Amino acid sequence: MLNERAKILLKTLVERYIHEGQPVGSRSLAKFSGLDLSPATIRNVMTDLEEMGFVSSPHTSAGRMPTTLGYRFFVDTLLVVQSLDNEQITLLENRMHPNNPSHLINVTSRLLSDLTQFVGVVVTPKRMGGAVFRHIEFVPLSEKRILLILVTPEGDVQNRIIFTETVYNQSDLIEAGNFLNQHYAGCALEEIRSGLQHELTQLRRNMTDLMNAAIEIGNAALQESSEAVVIAGEHKLFDVRDLSENLSSLKQLFELFERKSKLLQLMELSRQACGVKIFIGGESDETMLEEISVVTAPYEMEGKIVGTVGVIGPRRMAYERIIPIVDITARLLSNNLS
């Protein structure tokens, strides 16, 4: 357990390192800590902190820099979070209009990037209550191949091919599409499946088979696309000295942005948190790269957590400023979606 003096010096060291990007020496610690200590005493405390794994000393410098453990202790114990000023809150409120969910998600990721100058990330919500369609259409491709076209309430279009044992003519396909659009548009596909069981008296058996196949394939297609990662501001990482000096790490990071699956797993962990969660690079495999930290927060729709927002940047980021931006953005997004 650190005593109060060691905590103050560690806090000062992390703050100066975040601000300057250079190892911090005892003279700088004496100046900014507010403690009336001799350089020798400060060096002794730094030696203790280094032995405990909170700081490290590069061979090329007499100063010290925080380790992953040092960052974690700082964030969990020593950090004083700043409040957003009214101008920033007003900017968020004015630009986050709830007129279109897809547009709102894209705007949110760009806002996070603009306000932090790092990468803004939003995991789009999983569809509530199952996959829903606004319009459905069947297009013949060959005797036993049919193109299924599904349009979601958000305007997304999904195309899938249905392979059938039965040959359907053009009028059959139009009839099936019209029936589903007339009776079930706006309903969850799972609800339609059970509803079709009661329509056997009105529909021919082969038509019911076609519709059930469409429901099964359509449901899978919409669930596949029901969650995605929206990323904005990746290019801003080239302006971050800690990252731009290591092209290998930047390449790995951009590969993660391309694949998105690992990033989605990381963001998914945020759903279990009550409020902001911080992943600091080097702590585990979940944080992707040692030089990267991720600040995330879950957001809600109608009282249920449906996604996460986050900022990806260097470990040497101003956590006291980034955390409230992510927190308030998640709250505003929840309000607009609900």
UniProtKB/Swiss-Prot annotation:
Instruction: Choose any GO biological process term that the UniProt entry carries and state it.
Output: negative regulation of DNA-templated transcription
Q: Which InterPro entries match?
A: GAF-like_dom_sf (IPR029016), HrcA (IPR002571), HrcA_C (IPR021153), WH-like_DNA-bd_sf (IPR036388), WH_DNA-bd_sf (IPR036390), WHTH_HrcA_DNA-bd (IPR005104), WHTH_transcript_rep_HrcA_IDD (IPR023120)
Which keywords are on file for this protein? Repressor, Stress response, Transcription, Transcription regulation
- Its domain of life reads Bacteria
Molecular function via GO: DNA binding
What's the stated role of this polypeptide? Negative regulator of class I heat shock genes (grpE-dnaK-dnaJ and groELS operons). Prevents heat-shock induction of these operons.
Protein name, as recorded: Heat-inducible transcription repressor HrcA
- State the taxonomy lineage: Bacteria, Pseudomonadati, Pseudomonadota, Betaproteobacteria, Nitrosomonadales
**Name of encoding gene:** hrcA
